[in-house]
Amino acid sequence: MTPNDDDDTKVITFSSDYPDTDYRFLEANQEILDQIKNNKKLVIKGSLTDEAVLCTDDKTFTIRAGHTSNSMLLVSKDTNKIKVALQYHLELTEIQPKLNVLKDLLYSKAIDNSLDFEDDENLLGFSFDEIIDRIQSSEKEIQQYLLKLNTLIYKNRYIVLSENYEFKILELILSEATIGAWKLDNIPIDKCIENIRAPEFIIKHCLQLYSKQKSPTNSGGGGEEIKGGGGDDNNDENICSLDFNKVCIFRAKQLLTLSNKSNMKFEDFMDNWKDTLPIEIQPNFSMLKGIAILIPSSSTNPKEKSVKFINESILPTIPKARFKELFQISTRWSIDDIEPFIKSTIPPGNSLEQFILTYSRPITTSTGEKMIVTRF
């Protein structure tokens, strides 16, 4: 440009260090701008196998390049010199973080038996700082997921029990209840600790997981730090009141895991389920929402149903792939049945109905029932 008498005209030139590759253009929404203005922490987390993300205290955003047809110039306000010219900017999109990576990380060191505690304690689980460094997610989302995974804190390290070990400890607790003629809402914690050969805090952890009142002491990192007993309505710290529904689901999972390769007929499953429970507990299939569904036993007799166990945690994390696998399990779904298997993959800002219609289409059966089938 050349100067003239117009005061609005500016002379800009290229700086001596052009192009300065230290600069990037970032398109930020008001929330991110407020974080910057208020000196809040923003963290960019990279990965060798995945794209980088930007994390606030409670949200996670992908960082992707958005190209433009025109060059954008970054000009120093003080010198009017061009620092860099770019034809792209970085766009932020809020996402559901891939927290299955956190589950895989914790279960890579899951406690599978009592002997694991005889090893170096530093080899058990992970510290919160280690988790934060490795997982591409905000701290709050990580904390919430740690609670969902029923982690416990042992000497400032986050630990999970393998499903087999957790089931084994609860099985021993229920066996002690039978031997001692204890009611399930009146389990003496000290007797469990005395009679079961397992670390005390593991026994207390399992009692809390399956009790009516789960009141963990939260360390701020999302785990459960065992301080005392389960507790009942009388606040007796030595008494744990087991939740009948949780015990029902535990027994159902045992049956479903054993029969995972061959679906059980509904009537057989319900009979076997009842046989594993005390007489005062009456199971209902609705308890298994998000765990199992009913599918036709055969194409020739669609009215006869079988029970299909679905482990939501091992389904694909990519929505399209998850829907594809679910429709391979059953060609028709009700929204109520499919919701627990897809809700963890719904992008922020999307409604359940909007998300479902992206990958499926609604139909009405001959009996007037509203269902969804695959769109692909």
UniProtKB/Swiss-Prot annotation:
Subcellular location(s) of the protein: Nucleus
Keywords, sorted A to Z: Cell cycle, DNA replication, DNA-binding, Nucleus
Which molecular function terms from Gene Ontology are attached?
A: DNA binding
Q: Which GO terms describe its biological process?
A: DNA replication; maintenance of mitotic sister chromatid cohesion; regulation of DNA replication
Superkingdom: Eukaryota
What's one Pfam family here?
Dcc1
Cellular component GO terms, alphabetically?
Answer: chromatin; chromosome, centromeric region; Ctf18 RFC-like complex
Cite the record's Gly residues compositional bias ranges: 219-232
InterPro entries to which the protein is assigned, alphabetical: Dcc1 (IPR019128)
Q: Where is this region: Disordered?
A: 213-232
Protein function: Loads PCNA onto primed templates regulating velocity, spacing and restart activity of replication forks. May couple DNA replication to sister chromatid cohesion.
Q: What protein family does this chain belong to?
A: Belongs to the DCC1 family.
Q: Which PANTHER family match?
A: SISTER CHROMATID COHESION PROTEIN DCC1, SISTER CHROMATID COHESION PROTEIN DCC1-RELATED
Q: What is this protein called?
A: Probable sister chromatid cohesion protein DCC1
Source organism: Dictyostelium discoideum (Social amoeba)
